[in-house]
Amino acid sequence: MADVLERVTKIIVDRLGVDEADVKMEASFKEDLGADSLDVVELVMELEDEFDMEISDEDAEKIATVGDAVNYINSQQ
């Protein structure tokens, strides 16, 4: 799980320009990390590329926090 979290964190830091210390499992992309809807869509696309997976629109809508993303990726691998 640490490896997935590290990779997700790097993508978030690169995409949103936030401090790595702010990227916590419970952090909301929109409320805590300042992402807008387009940022979230782009994050999902980058996660798909990084982890070589397809995330359905229905599942993507459920990914609201860093922890949601990490748990989803772990459940699909």
Curated annotation (Swiss-Prot):
Record GO cellular component, one term: membrane
Signal peptide: none
InterPro entries: ACP, ACP-like_sf, PP-bd_ACP, Ppantetheine_attach_site
Location of the Carrier domain: 2-77
PTM notes: 4'-phosphopantetheine is transferred from CoA to a specific serine of apo-ACP by AcpS. This modification is essential for activity because fatty acids are bound in thioester linkage to the sulfhydryl of the prosthetic group.
A single MF term (Gene Ontology): acyl binding
Compartment(s) where it occurs, according to its Swiss-Prot or TrEMBL record: Cytoplasm
Keyword DNA-binding: no
Record keyword Cytoplasm present: yes
Taxonomy, superkingdom: Bacteria
Similarity comment: family membership: Belongs to the acyl carrier protein (ACP) family.
Alphabetical list of HAMAP family matching this protein: Acyl_carrier
Protein name as it appears in the record: Acyl carrier protein
